[in-house]
UniProtKB/Swiss-Prot annotation:
The keyword Magnesium is annotated on this UniProt entry: no
Gene3D superfamilies tied to this protein: Aldolase class I
Organism: Methylocella silvestris (strain DSM 15510 / CIP 108128 / LMG 27833 / NCIMB 13906 / BL2)
EC number of this enzyme: 4.3.2.10
Primary role: IGPS catalyzes the conversion of PRFAR and glutamine to IGP, AICAR and glutamate. The HisF subunit catalyzes the cyclization activity that produces IGP and AICAR from PRFAR using the ammonia provided by the HisH subunit.
The entry's keywords: Amino-acid biosynthesis, Cytoplasm, Histidine biosynthesis, Lyase
Protein's name in the database: Imidazole glycerol phosphate synthase subunit HisF
Broadest EC class assigned to this enzyme: lyase
Catalytic activity: 5-[(5-phospho-1-deoxy-D-ribulos-1-ylimino)methylamino]-1-(5-phospho-beta-D-ribosyl)imidazole-4-carboxamide + L-glutamine = D-erythro-1-(imidazol-4-yl)glycerol 3-phosphate + 5-amino-1-(5-phospho-beta-D-ribosyl)imidazole-4-carboxamide + L-glutamate + H(+)
C-alpha cells in the first residue's frame, strides 16, 4: 500500500504566495522560492505551485519563478495555472516541474488531456478540479480561479479525464477553500470511488485531524494544505506524525 502524501500548496499571484478564503480576500504569505526551500527542508512529500491568476489574466505562467523554485528544492513539484498547450507543459517540465496541472484548458478541450498524456506520459498530467456543491450529492466545476461556472458534474468529469489519460486528480472544494472546516468528504469520496488514479484532496484544512479524514474517510492518496503550514500553525513533521499515529502509512524519514 502506498504511503499517504502531504503536499503544501503555494498559490502564487504577482510572484508572491497568497492565501484567501473561498478564492477571494487574498493575504500575502511570502516569497515562493523561500517557502519551497522551507517545505523541502521540513520533509514535505511534494509541493504544488499554482499561478492562480494566469488563466484569468490570459498570460503564461511565471516560468522564472517555477525555475527558481525547482532549483531550490528536491521534492516533486506540480505546477499549474495558465497551462493551455503542449508547449506550455514542455516549458514547465524543462523549467524543473515534475507534473503539470491543467484545469481551464482541459474543460475547454478534453482532447488536450489525451494529447498531453500521450506526449509526456500520464504520470506528468494532473487534472485540477475546482468544484462547488449545487445540491446534495452534486458538485459543479468552476474555472478561471473559481469565477466561471461550467455546468459540468465534477464526478462525471473526473471519470472522463482519467479515461483520457490523466494520471492524478487535484480536487478542490470551493465551498471549503480557506474556511478551515475540513475537506468536503462526500465530494472527495465520490471522486475517489469513481476513478482509479490518485486523488489529492484540497480545500478546508484547519486541523491535523482534517488531514487524517481526507485519507481515511475521503479515500484521498494525498492531502493538500496551505494556511495551516504557511502561517506556522502546524509543521510538516507534526502533521505527518499525527497522521502516522492515527494509523496512516507516512514517509517519516527526513522530517524536521
Amino acid at each position: 500500500m502506498l504511503k499517504s502524501r502531504i503536499i503544501p500548496c503555494l498559490d502564487v499571484k504577482d510572484g508572491r504566495v497568497v492565501k484567501g478564503v473561498n478564492f477571494v480576500d487574498l493575504t500575502d504569505a511570502g516569497d515562493p522560492v523561500e517557502a519551497a526551500i522551507r517545505y523541502d527542508a521540513a520533509g514535505a512529500d511534494e509541493l504544488c505551485f499554482l499561478d492562480i491568476t494566469a488563466s484569468s489574466d490570459d498570460r503564461p505562467i511565471l516560468l522564472d519563478v517555477v525555475r527558481r523554485t525547482a532549483e531550490a528544492c528536491f521534492m516533486p513539484l506540480t505546477v499549474g495555472g495558465g497551462v493551455r498547450t503542449l508547449d506550455d507543459i514542455r516549458a514547465l517540465l524543462l523549467a524543473g516541474a515534475d507534473k503539470a496541472s491543467i484545469m481551464t484548458a482541459a474543460v475547454a478541450n478534453r482532447d488536450f488531456v489525451r494529447e498531453a498524456a500521450e506526449k509526456f506520459g500520464s504520470q506528468c498530467v494532473v487534472v485540477a478540479i475546482d468544484a462547488k456543491q449545487v445540491r446534495p450529492g452534486r458538485w459543479e466545476i468552476f474555472t478561471h480561479g473559481g469565477r466561471k461556472p461550467t455546468g459540468l458534474d465534477a464526478v462525471d468529469y473526473a471519470r472522463e479525464v482519467v479515461a483520457l489519460g490523466a494520471g492524478e486528480i487535484l480536487l478542490t472544494s470551493m465551498d471549503r477553500d480557506g474556511a478551515k472546516t475540513g475537506f468536503d468528504i462526500p465530494l472527495t469520496k465520490a471522486v475517489t470511488d469513481a476513478v482509479n488514479v490518485p486523488v489529492i484532496a484540497s480545500g478546508g484544512v484547519g486541523t491535523l485531524d482534517h488531514l487524517v479524514e481526507g485519507v481515511r474517510d475521503g479515500g484521498a492518496s494525498a492531502v493538500l494544505a496551505a494556511s495551516i503550514f504557511h502561517f506556522g500553525e502546524f509543521t510538516i513533521a507534526e502533521a505527518k506524525l499525527h497522521m502516522a499515529n492515527c494509523g496512516l502509512r507516512m514517509r517519516l524519514d527526513g522530517i524536521v
